[in-house]
């Protein structure tokens, strides 16, 4: 005979143990195990003696009422589906009267609050739920159109080669402006007014310009005209290259652009700083020319006195 497998051995032992329990005597065995006497106050009756006799396990069959429970579940699912369909076909206003789904009621209340706050029409999807993401996208597009968002004021990145070519053109323009200004007007003018022995001209206007007491008036007027011409040429160069010289070269303006909006209680901080830097550029060019003019006037005066 072939050896009995372990599973078969366990099954046989389990059946023998079950038969022993079915014969009774479980209460006496429990009393022996716990060491209790017959007159003990504690109950020594085993539940194995009180249950009905068991039989070997048989194949399980589906209960007779399973079909009834299945029918009931089908009816419940059909009712739930009909309720969902009726809610989807009902208008958005009727969602407030139906308390079956609290999530839909919550979305409806949020939509009503948004309507009262913004006085705008709330777009809803076919199920009656407000499309909040569509509203957010629409508000962002409106902000970008009005220029209120931070991204609306940000400039598009410019090719560094174009910026470098623009800077070279601006430096050439500034050099040519300084060269023409000093070579054709300031140097001859300073040389002549510092000369002590000079003959007066017949025109009073020329004599007024060459008068030493009118030096600052004539110098300031000439600087205003020269700087105006320079800035007109600079603006035309910026327009042709589509590059803002101050935005791409000023480190101060770049640092100001890094300040988050609302941190400093000054509206349009970047624009005001840019305007101040433009004014400072004009004043610095005027003061530089004035300092060089005073130094050259002293040198020419010393040369004429020799």
Swiss-Prot record:
Transmembrane is among the record's keywords: yes
Lumenal compartment residues: 194-214, 303-306
Main location: endoplasmic reticulum
Source organism, top-level taxon: Eukaryota
Intervals, Cytoplasmic compartment: 1-172, 235-281
Transmembrane regions: 173-193, 215-234, 282-302
One Gene Ontology CC term in the entry: endoplasmic reticulum membrane
UniProt biased composition (Basic and acidic residues): 1-18, 68-77
Ranges of compositional bias, category Polar residues: 34-57, 91-100
One Pfam family, short name: GET2
Subcellular location: Endoplasmic reticulum membrane; Golgi apparatus membrane
Keywords: Endoplasmic reticulum, ER-Golgi transport, Golgi apparatus, Membrane, Transmembrane, Transmembrane helix, Transport
Low complexity bias locations: 78-90
GO biological process, one term: protein insertion into ER membrane
Region listing for Disordered, in residue ranges: 1-100
Subunit structure and binding partners: Component of the Golgi to ER traffic (GET) complex, which is composed of GET1, GET2 and GET3. Within the complex, GET1 and GET2 form a heterotetramer which is stabilized by phosphatidylinositol binding and which binds to the GET3 homodimer.
PANTHER family given in the database record: GOLGI TO ER TRAFFIC PROTEIN 2 (PTHR28263:SF1)
Functional summary from the UniProt entry: Required for the post-translational delivery of tail-anchored (TA) proteins to the endoplasmic reticulum. Together with GET1, acts as a membrane receptor for soluble GET3, which recognizes and selectively binds the transmembrane domain of TA proteins in the cytosol. The GET complex cooperates with the HDEL receptor ERD2 to mediate the ATP-dependent retrieval of resident ER proteins that contain a C-terminal H-D-E-L retention signal from the Golgi to the ER.
Name of the protein this chain belongs to: Golgi to ER traffic protein 2
Source organism of this protein record: Lachancea thermotolerans (strain ATCC 56472 / CBS 6340 / NRRL Y-8284)
